[in-house]
Each structure stands twice: as C-alpha cells, then as structure tokens.
C-alpha cells in the first residue's frame, strides 16, 4: 500500500503542478497531453487486462515470450506489482469468490474491496500457497526476480523501476509528456480496483450467467477497463479470452487480441462453446 500511495503523491507533486505552468506557456501542450494520455492509458490498461489477467492468470491465449513481456510491462509500470503476487491473488479470488478467503470481495466493505485488502494480513498469501496457485509463473526467471523471494520488497522494486522509467520520460520528453503518462498510469491502476468494488455488488449491473457468486456485468466499468467490467461473463467462463459475450458488450481487449492475430502474433485463443453458454444462462436477468 505504501508504494501505491507514494505513487499517487508523486503524481500530485511532480505532475499536476508542473503541468499547469506548461499549459500556460504553450496551448499545443494540451493536445500533446491528451494524445500521450490516450496512448499511455491503452499501454497500461492493456498491460493489466490482456497481460496480467487474460494471459498470465487464465492462460486464455498464447503469444511469443518477447510480446508477453512487452504486454505485461504495461501493467508492471503502473504499479500492479509482482506478476506472481497478482496472479496468485486473482486465482484465489476465483477459488473463493464472495466467500471466506476471497481477498477483495466488496461484501467485506467498499474500502476493503478498493484498496484496504492490500494491507490486511488476513488476505496475504503464503509462499507455499503462491507456489501452488501459480507454478507456471514460478518457472519464469523474470517473474521470480520481480517477486523478490515472496517479500514486501517486490512492491519497493516495482516502485523503484517505475520511478526510473518516469524520470527517463521527463528527461527525454519533458514535463508535459511526463504528466500525461503519469496520470494515465494512475487511471489505469484504478480500473481493476473499480472491478473489485462495483462488479460484485448485487444492486449494480446484471447477471447473464449463473456462476454461484455476486459477479455483475457493469457497462461503464467495462468501458473504462477495456472489457473487464463484463465480470459476470468472466466468472462464468474464466478461461475465455473474450469477456464481452452479449450484444452490445464492447470488449476493447478482445478487439486488440484480434488485431494482433492478424499479424500471426496470437495463437490458441480459448473461447466458450455455445452449448456451454446455454447451460449457464440464467432465467432471471437482473
């Protein structure tokens, strides 16, 4: 939690204040800011949903290792932290969804679902459980290095690398690009937290499939998180690379995967069969 709060503080001190002065000097900076913000938001957002989530956590498709690292870097550089920690936490969430053992269910409170779970000892995952839940990631030397022997130092390492990355952006491209990239990374960091907070609340969204928990499809969360908000679909069919399964359920990450597929960079895409969808459909769509 400390590293994440420090990240937000860094944004306030070095980004927002300096950016105001840049706007006053050059109106062109506004368009530069918006362009960089959009590109950086896509880079970091796709890094989380396509990288950490659909690739590492659920293995719903395959890409060359160099591309895997490139995609995952987008999530790492917006302080998602150790991929091993992220994946083990997420796999545990699916195992105990909305039940005792779920790391970040909103049934334990809104603050808990958004950020509070990150520093509660009750949701910490031991090294032994982590190796059981994510043996595939432990076989990867880079992910083991970023995990720093299952200690709190993995967050400090992620923070340090992120600071160096953004210092390089400031040095090479100036304060406008720096501020835009930093703000985009903060927004991307918050997107999966919105999924935790709003996509398991019975009073929001709707359920298309019966999957034994409170997962909901929430359209505006799906827009902000590149398809993650179709959360009921995902919980019903966690191995599916496509989350937006219904009419009008826009899934930017799924579109991005199809774009990469045009160049032969994606293979073994996992999708649900129609008979499986029919089995899971609920009679009462709330």
Enumerate the language-model features and the residues they cover:
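Asparagine-centered polar/low-complexity signal
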Residues: 196, 232-233
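Active-site-proximal inter-transmembrane loops
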Residues: 137-145, 204-230, 236-237
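Non-catalytic, topology-defining segments of multipass membrane proteins
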Residues: 1-194, 198-199, 240-286
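Generic secondary-structure boundary/loop-capping signal
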Residues: 52, 58, 83, 112, ...
């Amino acid at each position: 939690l400390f590293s994440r709060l420090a990240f937000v503080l860094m944004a306030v001190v070095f980004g927002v204040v300096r950016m105001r002065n840049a706007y006053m000097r050059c109106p062109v900076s506004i368009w530069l800011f918006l362009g960089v913000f959009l590109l950086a938001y896509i880079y970091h957002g796709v890094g989380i949903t396509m990288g950490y989530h659909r690739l590492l956590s659920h293995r719903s498709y395959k890409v060359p290792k160099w591309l895997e690292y490139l995609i995952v870097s987008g999530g790492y550089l917006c302080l998602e932290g150790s991929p091993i920690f992220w994946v083990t936490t997420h796999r545990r969430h699916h195992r105990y969804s909305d039940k005792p053992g779920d790391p970040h269910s909103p049934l334990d409170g809104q603050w808990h679902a958004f950020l509070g779970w990150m520093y509660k000892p009750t949701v910490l995952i031991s090294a032994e459980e982590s190796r059981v839940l994510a043996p595939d990631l432990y076989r990867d030397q880079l992910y083991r290095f970023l995990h720093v022997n299952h200690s709190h130092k993995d967050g400090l390492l992620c923070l340090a690398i992120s600071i160096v990355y953004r210092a390089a952006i400031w040095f090479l491209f100036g304060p406008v690009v720096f501020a835009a990239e930093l703000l985009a990374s903060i927004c991307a960091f918050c997107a999966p937290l919105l999924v935790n907070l709003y996509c398991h609340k019975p009073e929001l969204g709707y359920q298309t499939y019966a999957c034994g928990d409170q997962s909901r499809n929430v359209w505006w969360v799906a827009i902000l998180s590149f398809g993650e908000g179709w959360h009921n679909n995902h919980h019903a069919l966690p191995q599916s690379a496509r989350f937006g399964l219904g009419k009008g359920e826009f899934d930017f990450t799924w579109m991005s995967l199809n774009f990469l597929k045009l160049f032969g960079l994606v293979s073994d895409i996992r999708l649900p069969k129609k008979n499986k969808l029919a089995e899971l459909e609920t009679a009462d769509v709330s």
